[in-house]
Amino acid sequence: MSVELEKANAVPDYESLRAEVRRIVDEVIRPNAETTDREGRFPRENLQALAETGWNGVLIPERYGGRGLDHVAFAIAAVEVGRGCPSTSLVYVMHVGAVQTIALYGNEDQKERWLRPVGAGAIGTYSTSEKASGGHWWFNFSEASRDGEDYILNAEKSFTTSSGQADFYVFQTRTPGAQTPTDVSFFIVDGGLPGIKPGVWDALGVRGNHSGPITYDGVRVEARDKLGTEGQGREILESGVSPVYLIGLGSTWLGAAQAALEAAVDYVKATIHRDFNKRLSDYQIIRQQLAEVKVLIESLKPWQVSLAKQLDELQAAGRPQVELLLPLVEFKIHAAEVAAKAAKAALDVTGGYGYKKGIFERLFRDTRAGIVMGPSNNIAREWIGKALVGLPLELWYEGGD
């Protein structure tokens, strides 16, 4: 057996990989979390720490300077980063998703130009959502135009993680001459191009991920940075953007849920009521609330690993990853709601002290984002319900859910 084949068939040591990421989180990311939230500071230092150890290129093939790991390793990393700082984890997930989309659909020139700089700390992200289509972020009303061999982009994107901070954007808009809002194409847009105008991000939670509005005002993109072919956006969305985004998003909220539970357990074990000489952990009602959260968190872990392995299997077989769309959406729904429940329980059991500025109220605010991030849990439940009763999802038709 060749060395290359042996390496391809080798199973990564996932616990060693987890420990590697956890060290970065403990040494760099978690200590920055409070400042990231309080000041709304973009977590560039955290992303640089991940880049220096190759984790920003977790899915990038080794021949382009990445680590060439699998979706299981990525999901583990997203959990661990989410445990330390959900803002950083969301930036990380969008970055990994953007570079994976280029790895899957880019040509050799694009991979060389856009993937190699990731090892030095270049940050990518998606730029898709528009206000006019709300939570249906795959619908666009902006439209690219041609100018010779170049493209001119004019769009107002409502939510773009790392807005104004990313080195490049995987940008979605309607194809020139498109007849419907879902005839979309993708472009790789250099973050330093003239005409890119980021707005302000001042939100309830995940305040460091800079998911603000961004305007593209006559941004000129060379034809060589069209990703895939004109009109290929549906395929890219279904099998490039959505799978890695959804497994990463759910993993982020799994990590946030674990952080809330761990902090709450530490607090109730250490806090003593001197009047009755009892720890908070001596009260049955406290233990029951924490136990309920623990059970929910444990229910997510094997599901996460199973989905990540299935993504790897589909990719290895050359099959479209859209086959896992609904299971990934279901995972996203449950992970987001478990995180919100965990943060609420942590706030409940810590009482007035949890309500003060600190990790408990911060996670309470941060975890609300998971429920509304696209596809919002309301929209996602409608997809699942339609599938259950045999109705078409109609994702790509005007008026569809």
Where are these predicted regions, by residue range?
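Short, contiguous pre-domain boundary segments
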Residues: 1-10
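C-terminal helix-coil-helix/basic helical segment that borders enzyme active sites and/or dimer interfaces
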Residues: 30-38, 298-334, 344-355
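Glycine-rich flavin
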Residues: 34, 38-161, 180, 388
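A short core secondary-structure module
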Residues: 156-197
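Glycine-rich phosphate/cofactor-binding loops in nucleotide/flavin-utilizing enzymes
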Residues: 352-401
